[in-house]
């Protein structure tokens, strides 16, 4: 992996969530920060690459706000909110807007087990849908791409996310 990383020019890394197994991080002092992120991605050619982070269901098992707080102290961990967007300039004629979504609050299986997902019920799903609608409507970007933990459509083992097909039909 280090040989590959040494020969590739990377502008940023985008995650699709489940940043920390099995139950997310608990706080800023959680050893998972060091053991599974800081020490793993410490190679000279990748340690300063920005990480644009999405949240997954395993992140909701922990303190997802610790990941937001971590971003305030570590500028390469970018997570200003549970969902957000960022515009990347491709060239003088094109740009790309990536919408980083928090899809876990839309999955009914998780909402029906709040003991496993303590922060999930605090998330305002309608506010995220409204934000998404407004952001896409107002976007002048050449391309808009949404990234989230759960795919709307998938040929993978978990299949489609039916809740997302109903709630986020424009995706």
Q: PLM features: residue spans?
A:
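Active-site beta-strand/loop signature of hydrolases that rely on acidic residues for catalysis
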Residues: 1, 9-24, 56, 145, ...
């Amino acid at each position: 992996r280090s040989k590959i990383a040494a020969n590739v020019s990377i502008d940023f890394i985008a995650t699709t969530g489940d940043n920390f197994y099995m139950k997310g991080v608990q706080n800023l002092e959680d050893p998972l920060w060091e053991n599974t992120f800081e020490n793993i991605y410490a190679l000279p050619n990748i340690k300063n690459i920005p990480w644009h982070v999405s949240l997954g269901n395993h992140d909701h098992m922990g303190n997802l706000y610790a990941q937001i707080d971590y971003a305030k102290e570590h500028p390469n961990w970018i997570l200003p909110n549970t969902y957000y967007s960022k515009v990347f300039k491709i060239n003088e004629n094109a740009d790309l807007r990536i919408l980083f979504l928090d899809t876990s609050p839309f999955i009914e299986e998780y909402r029906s087990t709040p003991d496993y997902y303590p922060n999930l019920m605090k998330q305002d799903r309608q506010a995220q849908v409204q934000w998404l609608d407004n952001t896409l409507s107002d976007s002048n970007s050449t391309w808009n791409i949404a990234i989230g933990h759960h795919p709307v459509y998938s040929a993978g083992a978990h299949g489609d996310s039916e809740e997302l097909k109903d709630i986020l039909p424009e995706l």
